Swiss-Prot record:
InterPro entries listed in its UniProt record: Ig-like_dom, Ig-like_dom_sf, Ig-like_fold, Ig_Fc_receptor, Ig_sub, Ig_sub2
Domain of life per record: Eukaryota
Lineage of source species: Eukaryota, Metazoa, Chordata, Craniata, Vertebrata
Organism, as annotated: Homo sapiens (Human)
Residues making up the signal peptide according to the UniProt record: 1-15
Swiss-Prot/TrEMBL domain comment: Contains 2 copies of a cytoplasmic motif that is referred to as the immunoreceptor tyrosine-based inhibitor motif (ITIM).
Chain ranges for the short sequence motif ITIM motif 1 as given in the UniProt record: 897-902
Name under which the protein is recorded: Fc receptor-like protein 5
Example of a GO cellular component annotation carried by this entry: external side of plasma membrane
Length: 977
């Protein structure tokens, strides 16, 4: 039987304890023991994440641990064991043990029980167990449930701790006891502790009280209220949600025991903190320092007492005595108000005195008291600011007079050769001083006196000898001209007006020493040299007679150097100059005095100028065009002489322009078989130029033009040469492509085929005859013309498939027909097709007509027999029957024969049979057509190749007498298909 112990886990409340909290596992349903087969949902809740997130679950059972992960914080389980969870970045939770019991009776209890909770214990039984309504605590009967399954603890407290179980009876067997559940009631929060910002505050200072506690993690959402007390008196307004209480000022009367209470809402659980003593501290007052004897003349050796006293009594006070801020002595006294020290006066005891009193709450100083010890002055000492015997004119000298001993104030007097100079009074130690600038008259003996009321004391005399330093020298040139040429001789003169001998002169050029000379008296020295270009610059001289050199004003010397022959450099952004590039002409004379004016030339024509004020080089920029090819030079001039550079040649390459592609053919319209010339030419561009020719972006070939200009490429045209053409020009800089040019190669029309189409077997006056003309080859648009006996009937245009012309037949329409096809490249004429329109004679009446009709019927019968025989023979020969099922209905209509004239297609061999029934004057000729296909037959439109009508054609009507109107017959030299 499993004993389950509920663990207490605390969470921080009000920020008192900072630590990383563990997540908590919550159960649904809330029981730790359930029957096997039931499910329990575990929820992992953390206190630093507020939305479900990826969670790890650890399940340990019988020594084995299984790790699972869920995308959220929920896991549904059915297995017994110990479960823990871990959210991202959190520690592992405390373990929760679940028991999926196979017992017939179980007692269910919640995972955690806290003081003040309403607790339900549920006794559940399987079907074969009957409850006896008894629940036990620590094996003692606790209650009879009277058939109820739940036992309620309305307000849990520590007395409810114990082991609980319930009992029942198995049917026809024995008593059954449930598992034992151990209940341990936990406090929802820890006992509070009172904290104070200070337990020994100084009187008048504020204090903050804090009631610290921790809520259990399972009860972290339970609100707490707080109440603060001093002794048994409530502070403030009573219960508050804040764990802090502010006392704005603490006084001595506020000392006492302080404590606090924390309670859950609605005050079901209340806990008191321990009591803490707060002692208000009173700091010492400012002490008073007194001297004794008072107002006495304090000579050296007199005994003086200093007394320091406060106004309040303290358990212990530390007194300290100070002289000019330096500690002298200290005394610690108990329950006394003051302390004293005594000493005999010396000269060092003069000054300010004060004391401090400290009772542990900070030292408080007294006001300062001054003590003056009277001492006669000693002989003063006179000092100069410089120990040197030689003092130069203009220097600043300080005389310092000081008596080493003597009471203040002291009156000091300075003297020069017995004459009083100046007097000064000193109220502090250190003496006095006077300063002045020396002249030659200040040479002589000096002394000083000191007097503090007991008679003046005189110092020893000090001698002062004033030396005159040299004045600023003046540097001059031998020539007043500012411009001096290379090779000339120049003399520098350096001279001073005043100064004690001996004087050292030094000459400098740009701070570099040139020459020096020493003279025993005031005057000047000179220095000469021949000029070179390097002598340009600033010159000065110095004069020194032992008191530091004096420097003259700077004199500038400019040595003018003629310019040398300049060097011209051409700079372009690439190895070869190209139109559009920025050309920099760089001209530089290696030697020559500035400023230098540079001129730039192209083919001796001035481009421009540029000045170099400081010497060196100059540049001139050009944006290149084709005209900039040629010779360049530059010139340098600094006013003395002009120098011309060598000539440099520049060749400017011109990128090819976009080429133009043109077609050159023998006629306006390109025709199959023509020789086409493709001419490509770039109007601009440096040679050589390589031309590429393209048809539908496929390279046809390339041709080079070494001297520029255009290039041509020839083609013998076929129908495949229709399409888009372009060309490309490239002279090594950048290839340029022409615009696309479309070429359409025209095909001349072939010889057309003329076909006559009538609605019946015999053409009769009034029938609608269709003349169809078609050229099997030829570029559209094709114009078809129709002719009857070479007389134009009409014309039709057609892009494809031929054209037709309809005629309503009359007797005059018999004769020869032809057609012509023309697409602008030459007309082609079809072969002639003959059309006969005939009829019976006028005396076709009575018996004769009947005889003729009978004869015609006989002939028709013979013709039908011949047709059947011909079809049978055709089948035996493997030819397609006339009634081919693949034909369309229009193709099988025997009433719409079609007549063609197809040149070189089939050779027809007619067999003629005359039919002249009863000797009448109308003779019919029967034509049997024998078709012999030639190997070189020309293909035609499939619709013209179908078999239409009977293979027997009445090709000619011979009239023996005057024709009469009647049925019409058609004859054609074209084969019947």
């Amino acid at each position: 039987m499993l004993l389950w112990v509920i663990l207490l886990v605390l969470a921080p409340v009000s920020g008192q304890f900072a630590r990383t909290p563990r997540p908590i596992i919550f159960l649904q349903p809330p029981w730790t023991t359930v029957f096997q087969g039931e499910r329990v949902t575990l929820t992992c809740k953390g206190f630093r994440f507020y939305s479900p997130q990826k969670t790890k679950w650890y399940h340990r059972y019988l020594g084995k641990e299984i790790l699972r992960e869920t995308p959220d914080n929920i896991l549904e389980v059915q297995e017994s064991g110990e479960y823990r969870c871990q959210a991202q970045g959190s520690p592992l939770s405390s373990p929760v043990h679940l028991d999926f019991s196979s017992a017939s009776l179980i007692l269910q209890a919640p995972l955690s029980v806290f003081e003040g909770d309403s607790v339900v214990l549920r006794c559940r039984a399987k079907a074969e167990v009957t409850l006896n309504n008894t629940i036990y605590k620590n094996d003692n009967v606790l209650a009879f449930l009277n058939k109820r399954t739940d036992f309620h603890i309305p307000h849990a407290c520590l007395k409810d701790n114990g082991a609980y179980r319930c009992t029942g009876y198995k049917e026809s067997c024995c008593p059954v006891s449930s598992n034992t559940v151990k209940i341990q009631v936990q406090e929802p929060f820890t006992r509070p502790v009172l904290r104070a910002s200070s337990f020994q505050p100084i009187s008048g200072n504020p204090v903050t009280l804090t009631c610290e506690t921790q809520l259990s993690l399972e009860r972290s959402d339970v609100p707490l209220r707080f109440r603060f007390f001093r002794d048994d008196q409530t502070l403030g307004l009573g219960w508050s949600l804040s764990p802090n209480f502010q006392i704005t000022a603490m006084w001595s009367k506020d000392s006492g025991f302080y404590w606090c209470k924390a309670a859950t809402m609605p005050y079901s659980v209340i806990s008191d903190s321990p009591r803490s003593w707060i002692q208000v501290q009173i700091p010492a007052s400012h002490p008073v320092l007194t001297l004794s004897p008072e107002k006495a003349l304090n000579f050296e050796g007199t005994k003086v007492t200093l007394h320091c006293e406060t106004q309040e009594d303290s358990l212990r006070t530390l007194y300290r005595f100070y002289h000019e801020g330096v500690p002298l002595r200290h005394k610690s006294v108990r329950c006394e108000r003051g302390a004293s020290i005594s000493f005999s006066l010396t000269t060092e005891n003069s000054g300010n005195y004060y004391c401090t009193a400290d009772n542990g709450l900070g030292a408080k100083p007294s006001k300062a008291v001054s003590l003056s010890v009277t001492v006669p002055v000693s002989h003063p000492v006179l000092n100069l600011s410089s120990p040197e015997d030689l003092i130069f004119e203009g220097a600043k000298v300080t005389l310092h007079c000081e008596a080493q001993r003597g009471s203040l104030p002291i009156l000091y007097q300075f003297h020069h050769e017995g004459a009083a100079l100046e007097r000064r009074s000193a109220n502090s130690a250190g003496g006095v001083a006077i300063s002045f600038s020396l002249t030659a008259e200040h040479s002589g003996n000096y002394y000083c006196t000191a007097d503090n009321g007991f008679g003046p004391q005189r110092s020893k005399a000090v001698s002062l000898s004033v030396t005159v330093p040299v004045s600023h020298p003046v540097l001059t040139l031998s020539s007043a001209e500012a411009l001096t040429f290379e090779g000339a001789t120049v003399t520098l003169h350096c001279e001073v007006q005043r100064g004690s001998p001996q004087i050292l002169y030094q000459f400098y050029h740009e701070d570099m020493p040139l020459w020096s000379s020493s003279t025993p008296s005031v005057g000047r020295v000179s220095f000469s040299f021949s000029l070179t270009e390097g002598h340009s610059g600033n010159y000065y001289c110095t004069a020194d007679n032992g008191f530091g050199p004096q420097r003259s004003e700077v004199v500038s010397l400019f040595v003018t150097v003629p310019v040398s022959r300049p060097i011209l450099t051409l700079r372009v952004p690439r190895a070869q100059a190209v139109v559009g590039d920025l050309l920099e002409l760089h001209c530089e004379a290696p030697r020559g005095s500035p400023p230098i004016l540079y001129w730039f030339y192209h083919e001796d024509v001035t481009l421009g100028s540029s000045s170099a004020p400081s010497g060196g080089e100059a540049s001139f920029n050009l944006s290149l065009t084709a005209e900039h090819s040629g010779n360049y030079s530059c010139e340098a001039n600094n006013g003395l002489v002009a120098q011309h550079s060598d000539t440099i040649s520049l060749s400017v390459i011109v990128p090819v322009s976009r080429p133009i592609l043109t077609f050159r053919a023998p006629r306006a319209q390109a025709v199959v078989g023509d020789l086409l010339e493709l001419h490509c030419e770039a109007l601009r561009g440096s040679s050589p130029i390589l031309y590429w020719f393209y048809h539908e972006d496929v390279t046809l070939g390339k041709i080079s033009a070494p001297s520029g200009g255009g290039a041509s490429f020839n083609l013998s045209l076929t129908t495949e040469h229709s399409g888009i053409y372009s060309c490309e020009a490239d002279n090594g800089l950048e290839a340029q492509r022409s615009e696309m040019v479309t070429l359409k190669v025209a095909v001349p029309v072939s010889r057309p085929v003329l076909t006559l189409r009538a609605p019946g077997t015999h053409a009769a006056v009034g029938d609608l005859l269709e003349l169809h003309c078609e050229a099997l080859r030829g570029s559209p648009l094709i114009l078809y013309r129709f002719f009857h006996e070479d007389v134009t009937l009409g014309n039709r245009s057609s892009p494809s498939g031929g054209a037709s012309l309809n005629l309503s037949l009359t007797a005059e329409h018999s004769g020869n027909y032809s057609c012509e096809a023309d697409n602008g490249l030459g007309a082609q004429r079809s072969e002639t097709v003959t059309l006969y329109i005939t009829g019976l004679t006028a005396n076709r009446s009575g018996p004769f007509a009947t005889g003729v009709a009978g004869g015609l019927l006989s002939i028709a019968g013979l013709a039908a027999g011949a047709l059947l025989l011909y079809c049978w023979l055709s089948r035996k020969a493997g030819r397609k029957p006339a009634s081919d099922p693949a034909r369309s209905p229009s193709d099988s209509d025997s009433q719409e024969p079609t007549y063609h004239n197809v040149p070189a297609w089939e050779e027809l061999q007619p067999v003629y049979t005359n039919a002249n029934p009863r000797g009448e004057n109308v003779v019919y000729s029967e034509v049997r057509i024998i078709q012999e296909k030639k190997k070189h037959a020309v293909a035609s439109d499939p619709r013209h190749l179908r078999n239409k009508g009977s293979p027997i054609i009445y090709s000619e009507v011979k009239v023996a007498s005057t024709p009469v109107s009647g049925s019409l017959f058609l004859a054609s030299s074209a084969p019947h298909r």
